[in-house]
Amino acid sequence: VLAQLPEAVLEGDDGLRWQPLPTAAPEATASLLECRFAVVDVETTGRRAEQERITEVACVTIERGRITETFASLVNPGMPIPPPITALTGISDELVATAPPFAAIATELRQHLSQAVFVAHHASFDRKFLTAELRRADETFVWTAPTLCTVQLARYLVPGLDNYRLDTVTAHFRISNPARHRASGDALATAQLFLRLLERLIEQDIVAVDAVTALLAKQKRTTRRRPLPGEDRHHE
């Protein structure tokens, strides 16, 4: 399902120095001002990407500081959805019974991911699941796009919060999410959060993708710890 978002959501900040979009896939040295971003959220049957499956996926595209389009689809995982997952997300076996399998949406989803920096809240979780599903659909698939995690970005740019669950960080920025624990709602909230964090990076003159990834890698090494209660990806 491809959908245009309301005009109020699509409008960007004209005060930022956005540049024309590139035609090639983003390099690590690319400027944040030039990049296309694919902000993604997945809902799944569990935590292990190799054993579990995606039940819903959404991708929000950001170009030149504006949310321009969204893709969202329920996915038939081909396996039962555990009751605790249904209780959390509202996604049941009945809801996905007539949904397409992941392979049926893989090509369209790849179009949204192509030539884009991958962004997600707890990005390693979403990327592992997407990589596993995309490889099942096409065993030759290779994904080299840079990745930015809004959890790590928020820890660096908004220090001192009680935790960095999506609810907590979006509340800090007064971003609403009426569809919590559904891929479309969480992806849109994450995209709006990322735009706020992107503004702060640019204000600090951190404008290269590789500069951001290096900064986050350094921060991760110095702040490595066990997750706080409630920070588990399935209960964030």
What positions do the PLM features span?
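Acidic two-metal-ion nuclease catalytic site recognized across multiple nuclease folds
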Residues: 4-15, 23-29, 195-236
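Conserved non-catalytic scaffold segment of RNase H-like nuclease domains
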Residues: 19-27, 33-144, 159-164, 168-177, ...
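Short, glycine/acidic-enriched loop or turn micro-motifs at the edges of active sites
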Residues: 44-46, 152, 189
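Conserved beta-strand -> loop -> alpha-helix junction used to position metal-binding or nucleic-acid-contacting
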Residues: 142-154
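Acidic, divalent-metal-coordinating active-site segment for phosphoryl/phosphodiester hydrolysis
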Residues: 182-195
